[in-house]
Amino acid sequence: MTFFRQETKFSCGPASIRNSLIALGFLYSERKIRELSHSDRLSGTSEKKIWRALKQLGFGYKTFQNRTEAAFKQRVVYNLKKGNKLILLTDHEDHWISVVEYGNKYLTVIDPEQKRVRKQLTPRSFGK
């Protein structure tokens, strides 16, 4: 499965949507997702913009926040085991990534800003 880097400096949100949908077997261009989410150079992509794009593409979403890092990691693994794909806000709420799989005790993390977008991390090392 091929995942993609973000096409602009401000489009990590649409790129993360794109990569999550690829993991589900759907292919959309980042440009289309940028248009649907109204991402822009000044403010990037807010949570509401992510939700808007997913809804317009016909996909559901759930939001969650956790009080502890341990609860967060547990929820990530739980959702991946159920077959869900995650789009997560990181770096002090400034950068979107996707987490698309859990297997053999590793998370498959897709960071569209990195040259090698796919990383395998243990839940313990995730978030550090």
Model-predicted segments: where are they?
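Conserved active-site-adjacent core of cysteine acyl-enzyme catalytic domains
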Residues: 22, 32-128
